[in-house]
Amino acid sequence: MWNVDVTCIGGIRSGEATLRPGPNIVQASNFQGKSSFLAAIQTAIGTTGLLTEDHPLMENEDDGKVTLETDEETYTVSLTRATDSDEPAISRSGTPYLTRDQDQIAARLFAVLGEDNPIRAAVREENQERLTELLKKPLETENIDLRIEALQREIKELEDEVAAAEAASADLPAAQQKVTRLQGELRDLNETRDELERKVDEETDQRALRDELTAKQSDLEREEARLERLENQVDRRKAQLDDKEAALESLDIPDSPTAEADIAEKQTRIDELAVKIDLLDDLHRSTKAIIDEGEIDLITDVERTLSGDTFSCFVCGAETTAEAVTERLNEISDRQESLREQRATLTEEVTQMQQRTREIESKRQQKAELEDEIKRLRVDIQEDQHEVRSIEATIEELQAEIEQREAEYEAAEKAGESHSAELKTIQQKIGSTETKLDRAQAELERIEAELQKRNDRQEQLETKRDELETLRQRRKQKYNELVNQFDAAMADIIGRFAPGFDGAYLDQKTDANDTVGFEINLARDGHTTDLDTLSEGERELVGIVTALAGYRTFSVGDRVPCILLDGIGQLAAEHIRHMIEYLENTAEILVTTAYPEAGSFDGETVSPEHWDVISHETAQSRDHPQITN
């Protein structure tokens, strides 16, 4: 049961009403506050001021308020007009029934079915593009499309990196062949040098000096090549260290959620609630069937009197009446709903805790990996730098020794024969070839490192593709469910209302860019037709069915237990009754409006008799139109 207290909302200066489970019909003539009362309920649940709409504060009033009292909680929402600007803006304060943006958007689109409902308006205006935008809105609040776009960009970047690595792999055979060729050339040069050295040894006594000088020169070239490779390696590792440290610094690990024991406890509570709900449901259904069918005398003795029938309670034996049993059944129904709400709340909490635990664990693992890699890189850099300093000292010593040996060799060379010049040339070629070989080996190592990087990026690419497919499947599942719910609801509506068309279908279309669109198509007399061929009432009927499909697809009933229906004056009185009967089992509380001439309806009648509303004349004197009907 809901109690609603309204002050300065729409056309209601003050008023209050009680809403009970089942249909609640606000029945009155124009300018008695019917639509304003529904706007007040909207304000309390938090669905006003969305989609570029204004809050329904009464014209020329600076403050308004709605208080919603449920069986468990009281919600108060205030509207305030800012008076310090040329175009006063209306702000909302307080805590509405719905606080999350995605819940408010879903309820505005699919539970608040007034004449200004955006879904009904899009169908009424035959705006299929706007209809698509609105039907996709709840998923936008989950950022699914944005997350898909971000993943697509990340996948494109990874694919480019993999392609670059693949291009590098194409150079691998040539690099391997170059290293093999240079190794062969170096072997040939060494053999030639050995032969020349033997000839020179036969003609001169320079062997000791030459060997020592050659060894020192070879040592120097090798050390210089080692130094170059080490310096390049230090630079690469420093760049990797900067990247890892930046990634570690940007990594945000949320606080740890409640322990696993809390999750297990909540799950146990959910299971217990499910058992209780089933037990109460069995008791309620069987007892209500006996009362509704008037078959109480099957299980107990009934005493029929002028003042009313009484009988012995078939459970405790006490004397009671059908009215008392019915009242007790209503209490059991209220208890059932309370247990369902508790179960839904606990289920959502468990889901959120489990998701948060997985996210935290993933980020912790990522942090540990980054910290290990940073530690390893720092140790490697320190070792490399120490080795660089050692090599630099060795190079300085070799350069000094070579300079000394060259002077000694040049002095002794004059006594040598013609083979000395050729030997020197070969020695220079050997040094040059060794340098080329070192560079070729370094290039080969770089290409092999690129191939390893490709493998790492390929693993990341597969992970991102799996994540993208998961999001696409969730989006596809919701879109398919939306189409199925529309088809099911439309089949029910056609059976109940017998409109002037054979069927309506919500078609889902996907373009080359993977963008999904929706379009309503109709069938009449075996042919496909458009919305513009429908009557005004038929078009409103299709709009309401579309909104109901969204209500069921996005589980709006689990977020707010009511549907508000207004602006259905285009429907005949019997069709309004059919609509109320159809919606009665969709939401716990149904609130709709009707004119007195529509006759009586089953359910709770809400009378604005004691409300203080602005009159028709007052409404016409306003600078802007006001909700008053």
UniProtKB/Swiss-Prot annotation:
GO MF assignments: DNA exonuclease activity
Keyword Signal listed: no
SUPFAM superfamilies xrefs: P-loop containing nucleoside triphosphate hydrolases, Tropomyosin
Coiled coil region boundaries: 139-282, 318-487
Localisation: Cytoplasm
Domain of life from the UniProt record: Archaea
GO cellular component terms attached to this protein's record: cytoplasm; DNA repair complex
GO terms (BP aspect): DNA repair
Keywords attached to this entry: Coiled coil, Cytoplasm, Plasmid
InterPro entries for this protein: P-loop_NTPase
Main location per the UniProt record: cytoplasm
Family: Belongs to the Sph1/Sph2 family.
Function: May play a role in a late step of replication.
PANTHER family in UniProt: ABC TRANSPORTER ABCH.3
Name the record gives this protein: Smc-like protein Sph1
Native source organism of the sequence: Halobacterium salinarum (strain ATCC 700922 / JCM 11081 / NRC-1)
Organism classification: Archaea, Methanobacteriati, Methanobacteriota, Stenosarchaea group, Halobacteria
